[in-house]
């Protein structure tokens, strides 16, 4: 079944709701898309994520403008590289390298084998346990002013795990932040900033790659999905930043485990294929 505007809008809603929560937007898009009759695929996911990253840019626009400005001035020697905002720009650059390199090296596996629903179900519950442990036992004392180069790279490696559907980009980086002793707010804030270059570059790369292959893209539904993802994503960011200031990540841990059970049940019922290329997708 080809994707229509209604399906595109619904998938955009799913993307906007799940991109910034540590529950895996790619996993949800794969499940919902397949149940609707067509897995949206890696290209649709990447393009749709441009909408949610536009929401990040809009929400943190003042911080981002300051970071980019100071980082650019540090490039030409007008500011020292240890200036806090210039340094944040360099840390985001460093943290983007792992996902860029690994994404290119393992692109074929990401788009085929790793999109199997047994993989998604397993990563949902497995990383739920890791997130729960990090939130429970992490010291939650450090702020972003204490972010080191080593920690910046570790955040980047955690983000690279999100290449596997079901892990969650924000879930991976937030979990790493908690394990390293950062506050919930600091971990989430850096997670959102770190995602911007990776997701934007990935979206445009996927777009170029699909066009160069002659792949037909359902442009209108994809555009609708991207706009919906932007609006919903902006609201979710605002809500999440307020929520984690007074609450733990336990609700998301419980949700991930429940979602994993549902995915396994749907696989057993034959509604979802266990592995890419099998079953009814």
From Swiss-Prot:
A single GO molecular function term of this UniProt record: undecaprenyl-diphosphatase activity
Membrane topology, record value: Multi-pass membrane protein
Source organism, top-level taxon: Bacteria
Bilayer-spanning residue ranges: 90-110, 113-133, 147-167, 191-211, 217-237, 257-277
EC number: 3.6.1.27
Keywords, ordered alphabetically: Antibiotic resistance, Cell membrane, Cell shape, Cell wall biogenesis/degradation, Hydrolase, Membrane, Peptidoglycan synthesis, Transmembrane, Transmembrane helix
GO CC annotation: plasma membrane
InterPro entries linked to this entry: UppP
Pfam families named among the record's database cross-references: BacA
Family statement: Belongs to the UppP family.
Summary of the function given for this chain in its UniProt record: Catalyzes the dephosphorylation of undecaprenyl diphosphate (UPP). Confers resistance to bacitracin.
Note: Bacitracin is thought to be involved in the inhibition of peptidoglycan synthesis by sequestering undecaprenyl diphosphate, thereby reducing the pool of lipid carrier available.
Designated name of the protein: Undecaprenyl-diphosphatase
